[in-house]
Amino acid sequence: MTYSFFVDMTCGGCSKAVNAILSKIDGVSNIQIDLENKKVSCESSKMGADELLKNIQKTGKKCSIIA
């Protein structure tokens, strides 16, 4: 399943932090980060949107589920 999130990223460091968190989760793949539009998309075979959102929130950035 593919999920999209709004993440209030302001720099490359923010996007790297989000990528690092998602990359460590088993079953997450195809991570795409659009820094300009503050959008993060990924595929997950084991985790739902709410669980992914909780992990992204560990970066300290405001975020919400888009789809």
Swiss-Prot record:
GO biological process, one term: copper ion transport
Tagged with keyword Ion transport: yes
Gene Ontology CC terms: cytosol
Residues reported to bind Cu cation: C11, C14
Superkingdom classification of source: Eukaryota
Example GO molecular function: copper-dependent protein binding
PANTHER family per UniProt: COPPER TRANSPORT PROTEIN ATOX1 (PTHR46365:SF1)
Protein name: Copper transport protein ATOX1 homolog
Lineage of source species: Eukaryota, Amoebozoa, Evosea, Eumycetozoa, Dictyostelia
